[in-house]
Amino acid sequence: YFTLDTLEYLAKGGRIGAVGALLGSIFGIRPIIHVLEDGNLEPYDKVRTRKKALKRLLEIANEQGELEEIFIPNALVPEDAEYFRAEMAARHPGVPIWITQIGTPLAAHLGPGAIGLFVRQKAK
């Protein structure tokens, strides 16, 4: 799951319309985007403010049960990545946490300020 700092890059990439991006920006909408197994992006939730978006990503990750690994890809927001690391380490001690930069193709659609929180569940 990802959240974005701005809708501008989704509009530039043709993923949403210019009017939707403008209205989303005016109202402070921060989408939560689900990355499907095939790599496609799907809207999952919407919240107002970045702080609420970060908290929502943590909620989603913590609903996944016992974890094997945690991945935090980000686009130029190391302070948010460290916040996620601290929160997830406290909740899931001993689970490896990897902070990475978002790859260029995905970053071109998501823009700077994008951050994700991906988890791998332990096999049952």
Language-model features: locations:
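Mixed-charge interfacial surface used for oligomerization/domain docking
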Residues: Y1-K124
